[in-house]
């Protein structure tokens, strides 16, 4: 990870950590850079960059700043307006854009925001390009093996255009609808749109496929995105599904790149459940290429036990859908994701897509003629305790000999009945200590043992 761009882009509190000036510089550099790449390939047409945003009040400010920067550099800006992160990735790829930009801080509160950069393949932008953007933000410009005193401004007819591109968002919706291989007629579906990017798209897709659609948290006002809503506050959807007698519920986050489910009884169906359900579905149909489901180190111990029973292989990556997709692309895997609900179906998308995940869960239910509770039941989730310890030095705390000895002792005590995971946060001064075991008391006991050592060694803030 670089100075500004982490695994989920450049993220921070709007107006403080992430400012309009930052956004202008990102647009300024990308507009110039992709124009320069075109010129080097003998193409004098302006670079084309597609932009989407979520419903935060600050998203409009950042959109205007990005557009000002890129058009000042001579690139054309295509505006999808309020849309989802996966829609930007899809349109960047199928409509031959030089790159895509999504303005969102995902599941964070309204006062945060972020800038996610997507390449022409619909994948997260390469690290080397992100480093060039960061250098420009910091006043350095060394590109194409030479130093540049400053970026030139486009003039006259070479100033970039701004294009209203709602048609791109509609094309994405049409693509999702085309993936619905069964009619949803007669199925009562609840949607929690988190007052975010999916607020209009999700219902339109489900309505088009014939579902009886019931929606909550689809009235964004710029300040209520993720507010007691969506996949990080799923209790609202649980209550809604039970009260309305719905067959299934789906909860998205602010930019709709993740999805969690609620079964007809009001139980939460996590990302691990989704991986299990769809992994088994593909295995039964002989379509689980490489016989592997890709997970992260945070997936539940019970998931691996269940996969072993079904003779399904699995891989574990670092936390982040970026790493999941990289492994999938390199090894030809069809499904992977995270416990949090970032699920990637590589045949259909290059990033996590909450609405697509919903459609795939509907497909399994309808194909097998079983309710979600029955599909999820075989996966026994192990109790888990996670404690975040704020520390002065993440790496020193994690690599401390006494801490490592404590971790080793816990791992040996658990044996094959559970596991311990200690890792540093990618965005905060935090070390995360997580234990999974057959019961909650055992989890808490072993987490406390390791946390106490971290604190006794003087690392805690």
Q: Model-found features: residue ranges?
A:
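Short glycine-rich phosphate-binding loop at a beta-alpha junction
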Residues: 43-54, 188-190, 291-297, 432-434
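Proline/glycine-rich low-complexity loops and linkers
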Residues: 80, 131-173, 178, 264-337, ...
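General beta-strand structural signal in soluble alpha/beta enzymes
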Residues: 5-6, 51, 77-82, 102-103, ...
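An N-terminal, well-structured beta->alpha segment
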Residues: 1-68, 72-73, 162-186, 395-396
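Phosphate-binding and adjacent anionic-ligand microenvironments
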Residues: 248, 285-461
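N-terminal small/polar loop signature for handling phosphorylated ligands or for N-terminal nucleophile
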Residues: 36, 40, 48-112, 204-262
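Gly/Ser/Thr-enriched, mixed-charge loops and adjacent short helices
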Residues: 13, 113-242
């Amino acid at each position: 990870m670089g100075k500004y761009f982490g695994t989920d882009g450049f993220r921070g509190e709007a107006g403080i950590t992430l400012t309009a000036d930052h956004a202008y510089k990102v647009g300024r550099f990308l507009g110039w850079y992709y124009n320069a790449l075109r010129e080097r390939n003998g193409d004098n047409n302006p670079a084309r960059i597609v932009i989407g945003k979520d419903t935060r009040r600050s998203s409009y400010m950042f959109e205007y700043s990005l557009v000002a920067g890129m058009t000042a550099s001579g690139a054309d800006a295509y505006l999808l307006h309020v849309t989802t992160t996966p829609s930007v990735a899809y349109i960047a790829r199928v409509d031959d854009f030089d790159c895509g930009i999504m303005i969102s801080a995902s599941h964070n509160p309204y006062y945060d925001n972020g800038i996610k950069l997507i390449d022409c393949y619909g994948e997260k932008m390469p690290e080397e390009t992100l480093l060039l953007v960061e250098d420009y933000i910091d006043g350095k410009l060394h590109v194409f093996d030479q130093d540049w005193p400053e970026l030139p401004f486009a003039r006259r007819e070479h100033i970039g255009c701004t294009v209203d591109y709602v048609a791109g968002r509609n094309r994405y919706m049409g693509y999702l609808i085309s993936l619905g291989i069964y009619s949803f007629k007669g199925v009562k579906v609840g949607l929690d749109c988190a007052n975010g990017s999916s607020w209009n798209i999700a219902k339109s897709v489900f309505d088009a496929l014939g579902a009886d659609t019931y929606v909550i948290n689809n009235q964004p006002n710029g300040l209520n995105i993720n507010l007691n809503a969506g996949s990080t506050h799923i209790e609202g959807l649980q209550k809604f599904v039970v009260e309305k007698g719905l067959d299934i519920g789906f909860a998205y986050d602010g930019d709709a790149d993740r999805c969690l489910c609620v079964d007809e009884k009001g139980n939460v169906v996590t990302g691990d459940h989704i991986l299990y359900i769809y992994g088994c579905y593909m295995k039964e149909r002989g379509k689980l290429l490489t016989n592997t489901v890709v997970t992260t180190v945070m997936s539940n111990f019970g998931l691996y036990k269940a996969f072993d029973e079904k003779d399904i292989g699995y891989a574990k990556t670092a936390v982040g859908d970026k790493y999941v997709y990289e492994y999938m692309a390199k090894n030809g895997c069809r499904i992977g994701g995270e416990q949090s609900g970032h699920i990637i179906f590589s045949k259909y998308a290059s990033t996590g897509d909450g609405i697509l995940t919903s459609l795939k869960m509907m497909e399994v239910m309808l194909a097998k003629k079983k309710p979600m509770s029955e599909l999820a039941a075989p996966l026994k989730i192990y109790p888990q305790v996670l404690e975040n310890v704020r520390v002065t030095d993440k790496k020193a705390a994690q690599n401390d000999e006494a801490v490592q000895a404590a971790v080793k002792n816990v791992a040996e005590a658990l044996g094959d009945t559970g596991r311990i995971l200690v890792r540093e946060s990618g965005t905060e001064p935090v070390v995360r200590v997580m234990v999974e075991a057959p019961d909650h008391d055992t989890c808490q006991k072993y987490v406390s043992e390791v946390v106490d050592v971290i604190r006794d060694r003087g690392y805690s803030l």
